[in-house]
Design a protein with these regions (language model features):
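Signature of N-terminal electron-transfer/Fe-S-associated modules in redox systems
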Residues: 2-169
């Protein structure tokens, strides 16, 4: 079955725009299509559309969606009127591309204590949306966020011999 979805997309390009602007669109997608199909469609329709092709992380109607779930599931949850915006407005460089440079320092601290595998680094960046959930992350520029603490908890499980050093971070 097909779903017709009315979109309100909050777009922004740090190089050109002072403030975000809204683009409205209507799309028709199969309910079995994953959310990534919507982003691929928008990429083909919109000039210079920016999003992470490897990791879906977006706010739909003010709710964080960080998994590539089906359009049908999302329609059940959000209806057929979606407001799409970056999960990290202050760190957004272009549309849905988030500047992660500020996270290199906390990740380097962990690397100084124990090796970080490519799978562990992938986990770190999958937890990225959780770095922006608390008001602290909005007000303290050096605060790595709750995502970093979730990552540390996982690293402690995977590297118990360095647990005490990791807990000091």
């Amino acid at each position: 079955m097909q779903e017709q979805i009315q979109l309100e997309i909050l777009r922004f390009d740090i190089k050109k725009d002072y403030l975000p602007y809204t683009h409205k669109d209507i799309v028709i997608l199969e309910e079995t299509n994953p959310l990534s199909e919507l982003f691929a469609l928008l990429d083909s329709r919109l000039l210079h559309f920016g999003y992470n092709k490897h990791r879906i992380q977006v706010k739909i109607n003010d709710v964080l969606v960080h998994q590539d779930v089906s359009v049908g599931m999302l329609c059940e949850r959000f209806g057929r009127h979606w407001r799409l915006e970056s999960f990290a407005p202050k760190a957004t460089a272009h549309d849905f591309l988030v500047n992660t440079d500020f996270l290199s320092a906390p990740l380097a601290l962990v690397r100084n204590i124990c090796p970080v595998s490519s799978e562990e680094e992938e986990l770190f960046f999958n937890l990225l949306p959780f770095c922006f959930l608390s008001p602290l992350s909005q007000n303290l520029p050096d605060y790595a966020g709750e995502g970093f603490f979730l990552f540390l908890a996982e690293m402690i499980k995977m590297h118990p011999q360095q647990a005490s050093e990791l807990m000091r971070l």
